[in-house]
Amino acid sequence: MKASVVLSLIGYLVVPSDTAVLGRCVVAKKLHEGGLSDFEGYSLENWVCLAYFESKFNPMAVYENSRSDFIGYGLFQIRNHDWCDHGRNRCHMSCSALLNPDLKKTIECAKTIVKGKRGMGAWPSWTLNCQHSDTLARWLDGCKL
């Protein structure tokens, strides 16, 4: 009896840390529906790869890099200095809008970023992990779009 009470109490105290994490195929579908398939010449696989290496598919991720003095927001860890209202606001939106699991604002801002001269190279993680990968197709394996 005591053990079940203790386990029940522990169950109330433990909050899953990955509740906001989306599945790979869910991310692929949302990005596809948002028009990122072949946007500016980048395949959907590139976008899914980027999302994984930036946030592990967590649309509510916030990462503060105190060394470089920036904060990254959302699925693509969009940086505050240039893209949202805590900086130059080139995407014309609040940084908190980038934390919505529906991904609409995130996709809108990502399109603005990738139209720039650096394209997806604006994300160092894409350059390191996705750009020349010969296994990009795996990011869509088993996904129904």
Curated annotation (Swiss-Prot):
Any one Pfam family here would be Lys
| Stored InterPro entries | Glyco_hydro_22, Glyco_hydro_22_CS, Glyco_hydro_22_lys, Lysozyme-like_dom_sf
> Its encoding gene is what?
LYZL4
Q: How does it assemble?
A: Monomer.
State the signal peptide span.
1-19
Alphabetically, the GO molecular function entries are: lysozyme activity
- Function, as annotated: May be involved in fertilization. Has no detectable bacteriolytic and lysozyme activities in vitro.
Q: What is this protein called?
A: Lysozyme-like protein 4
Q: Where in or outside the cell?
A: Secreted; Cytoplasmic vesicle, Secretory vesicle, Acrosome; Cell projection, Cilium, Flagellum
UniProt-listed SUPFAM superfamilies: Lysozyme-like (SSF53955)
Gene Ontology CC terms, in alphabetical order: acrosomal vesicle; extracellular space; sperm flagellum
Q: Native species of this protein?
A: Bos taurus (Bovine)
Instruction: Give the family from UniProt.
Output: Belongs to the glycosyl hydrolase 22 family.
Paired cysteines (S-S): C25-C143, C49-C130, C84-C95, C91-C109
